[in-house]
């Protein structure tokens, strides 16, 4: 209880800039590590062929869905554990951890079963037997051996619920390093490994995830913590499962939006524009842009806790100062991202284009899409503000506008009217403008009625 109080005092009295840096930097590093898995895979797979890159780009939405289920379930488990630890009920917290890990195990088994019959998914987008074969080779391995990513993410959330964010970051770093080392060895057959192509990329990924999982399990089960996870609690408890999924299912839905968007965009490129190059280009963009967006998400995730605390403490000046600082930092991050994508698109795309088939398309894509980055800084800052002050529905609506509600219809119309891949990229700018317009109008009303009437408090 005393430690919790100190944490609360820090949230309310530590200088905002120092507090934001203190909370955001570990999150930024953790998220960048997650982004590296797919970026590294794409870099080495692109050295095989553009078709290989297209195949794993088609597989990516299913990988995103797996991670969405893992993160969503783990968020629900984390929320349940944190509440029980706050109540001083360590036995219930332990039961929440055990039940959460059990749910993650069951989820991994379901995905593994579907991994054996994944071929029809690729036939939705292409009739090319080589693309289908490479896609199945890659995704089947990732799904059948996907237990690593589920349990690793679950253990990371268990550690985070106990305030051990540094330990959770270490497990991610170790897994990423293993993946980066093994990728070229297993793809190209270096040293003791046979040449395995896209299958090698998949094996490198799952081995990295399993190494991270084993390390995370060791830290959870064998390191001294305030809770002890017992195997006897691995029997599912209906009430605990309901509490986990009460928070977890909305999180899974939110996390799945990106997967659905990827499927929709791939369908537009493959079935309307008949462009495998469009699929490969979008796959490269979506993975590279995560390196720009992950620092943004790290900052906004940290800021959400600061916003929520000072909103609850009715400290208007500190709330406003932290909000303005967050908007400024995110705008700088995204402006740097835009600048890099505008000035060096050829250099970035060429890293993933050994055959020269997507460079021209990639240059246009990176320059057009990156125009929405600074707008996204405002959109996402506003969205997490809604979450922090209890307007989660508005936050969800903004996410749907950004990635589904406006983006996919705009992409479809642009593809049908202009019949070019380049025209489709403008859907990102259109969707971002729509989302930020809704966000500004909604936040202005809320600010006037909920933020401005708060007492000044102390701005630090």
Regions from the PLM with identified roles:
Residues 32, 36-54, 122-129, 185-196, ...:
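Helix-terminus/linker motif at the lipid-water interface of multi-pass membrane proteins
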Residues 74, 78, 142-160, 168-176, ...:
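Short runs within selected transmembrane alpha-helices of multi-pass transporters and secretion channels
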Residues 1-24, 81-147, 193-249, 307-372, ...:
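Short alpha-helical transmembrane segments in multi-pass integral membrane proteins
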Residues 53-116, 149-168, 266, 281-339, ...:
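Small-residue-rich hydrophobic transmembrane alpha-helices
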Residues 13, 17-36, 40, 62-69, ...:
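Residue-level signal for short hydrophobic patches within transmembrane helices
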Residues 65-68, 179-184, 213-217, 290-294, ...:
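Hydrophobic transmembrane alpha-helices of multi-pass small-molecule transporters
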Residues 22, 44-64, 130-134, 198-199, ...:
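Interfacial/gating helices of multi-pass transporter permease domains
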Residues 22-41, 141, 152, 175, ...:
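Transmembrane helical elements of multi-pass membrane transporters/channels
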């Amino acid at each position: 209880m005393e430690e919790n109080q100190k944490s609360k005092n820090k949230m309310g009295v530590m200088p905002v800039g120092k507090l934001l840096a203190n909370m955001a930097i570990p999150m930024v590093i953790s998220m960048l590590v997650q982004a590296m898995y797919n970026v590294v895979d794409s870099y080495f797979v692109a050295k095989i062929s553009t078709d290989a890159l297209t195949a794993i780009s088609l597989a990516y939405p299913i990988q995103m869905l797996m991670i969405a289920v893992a993160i969503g379930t783990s968020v629900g488990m984390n929320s349940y554990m944190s509440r029980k630890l706050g109540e001083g009920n360590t036995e219930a917290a332990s039961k929440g951890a055990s039940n959460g890990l059990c749910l993650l195990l069951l989820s991994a088994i379901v995905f593994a079963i579907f991994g054996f019959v994944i071929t029809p998914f690729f036939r939705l987008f292409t009739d090319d037997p080589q693309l289908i074969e490479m896609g199945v080779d890659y995704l089947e391995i990732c799904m059948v051996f996907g237990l690593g990513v589920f349990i690793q993410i679950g253990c990371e959330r268990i550690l985070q619920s106990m305030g051990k964010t540094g330990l959770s970051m270490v497990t991610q770093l170790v897994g990423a390093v293993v993946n980066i080392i093994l990728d070229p060895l297993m793809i190209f057959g270096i040293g003791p490994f046979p040449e395995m192509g896209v299958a090698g990329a998949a094996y490198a990924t799952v081995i990295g995830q399993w190494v991270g999982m084993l390390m995370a399990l060791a830290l959870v089960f064998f390191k001294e913590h305030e809770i002890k996870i017992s195997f006897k609690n691995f029997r599912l408890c209906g009430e605990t499962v309901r509490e986990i999924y009460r928070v977890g299912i909305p999180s899974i839905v939110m996390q799945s939006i990106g997967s659905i968007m990827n499927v929709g965009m791939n369908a537009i490129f493959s079935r309307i524009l008949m462009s495998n190059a469009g699929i490969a280009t979008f796959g490269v963009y979506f993975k590279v842009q995560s390196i720009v967006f992950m620092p943004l998400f790290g900052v906004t995730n940290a800021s959400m806790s600061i916003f929520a605390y000072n909103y609850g403490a009715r400290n208007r000046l500190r709330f406003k100062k932290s909000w303005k600082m967050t908007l400024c930092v995110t705008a700088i991050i995204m402006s740097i991202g835009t600048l890099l994508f505008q000035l060096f698109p050829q250099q970035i795309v060429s890293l993933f284009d050994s055959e020269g088939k997507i460079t021209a398309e990639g240059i246009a894509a990176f320059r057009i899409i990156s125009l929405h980055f600074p707008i996204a800084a405002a959109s996402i800052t506003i969205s997490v503000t809604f979450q922090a002050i209890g307007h989660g529905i508005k936050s969800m609506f903004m996410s749907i506008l950004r990635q589904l509600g406006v983006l996919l219809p705009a992409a479809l119309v642009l593809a049908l009217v202009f019949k070019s891949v380049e025209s489709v990229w403008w859907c990102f700018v259109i969707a971002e403008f729509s989302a930020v317009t809704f966000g500004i109008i909604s936040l202005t009303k809320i600010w006037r009625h909920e933020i401005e009437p708060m007492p000044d408090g102390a701005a630090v």
